[in-house]
Amino acid sequence: FKRNKDIHFDIYYKIVNISRDTIFYSKCKVPDTTDGRLEILLLHLIILIRKLKRDRKEYLSQSIVDLMFSSIDLSFREEGVGDLSIPKKMKKVGMVFYGRSASLEDILDTEDELNKKSLLIDYFLRNAFSSDTSYKKNAEELSKYAIAFVGLVENISISEISRLDIQAIK
């Protein structure tokens, strides 16, 4: 018997597992580094949190964000980052998260689909590929995926999120 308030764990770890899918690092060529993995995790979390806010589930979205920060903090500690360096690193992660959130939500709220796709390509080039234009095709793949993932997430209930399957949109 699972308590309803524990759903944020199920949702967060489902998103973590989706973000580890090799498609992002092989087909889309996102660097398989800490920063690259963080970009893909944030992509999924921001889209999910956007849905939760629209569904008026702010408490659940905040619980997921809190869990993400706790998980990243723990990862730093497990990597041997010193206690004095953790706050500075976490501040940077927070700035990245809230900056990406604002940017990505603005892009996803764009009504013109061609403009949205173009903005997403620029977003991914800048953030996932360090503005290296030789990755434009990969940024295009990520933008198509992001739009498909938004469609997938928007059309399911909260209870279905922990069973999300991205196979159909890869």
Where are these regions (language model features)?
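Surface/interface-facing alpha-helical segments and adjacent flexible terminal/loop regions used
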Residues: 1-170
